[in-house]
UniProtKB/Swiss-Prot annotation:
Keyword Lyase: no
Organism, scientific name: Homo sapiens
Gene it is expressed from: APBB2
Record-annotated WW domain positions: 290-322
CDD domains per record: PTB1_Fe65, PTB2_Fe65, WW
Effect listed in the UniProt record for changing C702V: Abolishes interaction with APP and gamma-secretase-dependent processing of the APP membrane-anchored C-terminal fragment C83
Stated name of the protein: Amyloid beta precursor protein binding family B member 2
Biased segments, Basic and acidic residues type: 176-190
Domain PID stretches: 413-578, 584-736
An example Gene Ontology CC term for this record: early endosome
Biased composition (Polar residues): 212-230, 261-275, 331-340
Residues the record lists as Phosphoserine modifications: S123, S160, S334, S409, S412
Tissue-wise expression: Widely expressed.
Primary site of residence: endoplasmic reticulum
Amino acid sequence: MSEVLPADSGVDTLAVFMASSGTTDVTNRNSPATPPNTLNLRSSHNELLNAEIKHTETKNSTPPKCRKKYALTNIQAAMGLSDPAAQPLLGNGSANIKLVKNGENQLRKAAEQGQQDPNKNLSPTAVINITSEKLEGKEPHPQDSSSCEILPSQPRRTKSFLNYYADLETSARELEQNRGNHHGTAEEKSQPVQGQASTIIGNGDLLLQKPNRPQSSPEDGQVATVSSSPETKKDHPKTGAKTDCALHRIQNLAPSDEESSWTTLSQDSASPSSPDETDIWSDHSFQTDPDLPPGWKRVSDIAGTYYWHIPTGTTQWERPVSIPADLQGSRKGSLSSVTPSPTPENEKQPWSDFAVLNGGKINSDIWKDLHAATVNPDPSLKEFEGATLRYASLKLRNAPHPDDDDSCSINSDPEAKCFAVRSLGWVEMAEEDLAPGKSSVAVNNCIRQLSYCKNDIRDTVGIWGEGKDMYLILENDMLSLVDPMDRSVLHSQPIVSIRVWGVGRDNGRDFAYVARDKDTRILKCHVFRCDTPAKAIATSLHEICSKIMAERKNAKALACSSLQERANVNLDVPLQVDFPTPKTELVQKFHVQYLGMLPVDKPVGMDILNSAIENLMTSSNKEDWLSVNMNVADATVTVISEKNEEEVLVECRVRFLSFMGVGKDVHTFAFIMDTGNQRFECHVFWCEPNAGNVSEAVQAACMLRYQKCLVARPPSQKVRPPPPPADSVTRRVTTNVKRGVLSLIDTLKQKRPVTEMP
């Protein structure tokens, strides 16, 4: 017998019995199910509820539009999570409103499915829990007032609800102390193997009684099907009843960290010869492949055939292998030794621990509901669940390793070398910086400039890959920068076009190379920060360049051998001609003062040269003379302004220089240039300390030019005209010209010996 508190005079009291879940053994129930204990409602509140429901029925006569079942599924309830917003808040002011809302929602369900409202009290003396019987697969039938059942409500075993549970107990004790020792009694039916707890709602306060017996039926510990949350209020289709029941039972298996009775299972009461369990494993759907281990099921769909382990939910393409009995026994022993029987309070037992702690047995009702939910589920949910599990399982099992993928895609050539780098940008360089002895310092300055200058992070101009990580690959005589994400080539540079490369002096992970841009044709020094010492990149480049030089040397040797073979055959082809080897032009620079230019009448003559020098010196002041640089090369004499190196004042080809000499003053030097159309110009210069060096340089350029002309047209290839008569005027003039040229050459040789010509 349970005690009932008397209600206040102004408010009716609704007394509801709820089965206790504190000591319920979920997985070890072999006795037949018994209906829950019932209690007559002693108040007239049900009549008010019936009136409200009838009033609502007149308004909402048309059922709502049909919805898909998966839209009505409570995701949090299916996953075993608690919704704090969905927990009932029982109070004095909200009890009547909540009951009316529950009645309206159940009326909509009855109108759509043509069934009786499971939560509506049919009469003050007859209350039937239709929902509980429907979940058990039974047909509802009316009973007398003493055996009518009320929907058992079990509190959710979550941390937040347990706190609320404790608050309700505290408030109930205070209410009991305030009201005194007024108690009411209620009759209840119970069996010897079951224990119950009563829940009494009076004036909106909840009082939980302690269980009278240590064990109770699992049916009494089912989760309540009527909730105050909006998701659970919605109607559920008939085809989803088994699925919902299975989900509620699975959620019911989640152990509580506050109640040790839920985590400590009794192995003594397990019946290995339970008829329900044998019926489950002998079902035809699980016997499609008798060679499969227990718990495995073969599933075939459009994607192929795969195997599903029902207790754990894992899927795999490979066929599972049965474990021998001796291994299974050893495995059970090891698991039981690892997992202690008294579970700590701060730990939760997974599904597999329930099976292990219970001797490998799981309650037959749980298997029935789980089997019903998996064999005949909603088609849309089944298709979605299968595809999701299959995709996740295959992704986790067959996903390729990223390192292997990178190595396969990048190192396609076994001789290719890959380095992880990050671009720091580039700096423009001048041609003079790459001269021998200067290139090393210039490259190191570029590395320092880009390594230590902290520019704006958004300024990524000239930085390959916007400063992100990339791969520097040396493959097939090419230096390539590759994006590690999509393998796109950001930049490629032929190794033979790289002028200089080097490693930073301050940081051994800085690498730089200098090459000419293929579009702008300017020299750029590209700098990179490497993940590994940059010496490896420099060594690899050196090896590649050595290989290229060796290949070119071999090709040249083959070409020479082919030329010798052709010479032996006496083939008169142009390839047999020995061309002069080109050499770098030697330029001599002199700092002089430019007096100016004066037109003259004749191209040669010392008197004409001296006359032009005197005229320019008398007509101009020394302050007006320009400081210039005279560059004397083999083919050109160039006069450039000293202030602006890009300003060319005079440019005279040596082939057009007709006369040169030193004036009466040893500081003066002048030359006459033929501009064409019988026009001649005399350019005058003032030299310090004297004009000897300048005159010798120009003289050497003239001699070199003359010898090049002789080499270009040797005497053997000249077309010789017929010799004139011995007494003709032409022969006498030709002889005089030859003598004059030879005497001029002899005079120049006496002044300065000519260097050996190439």
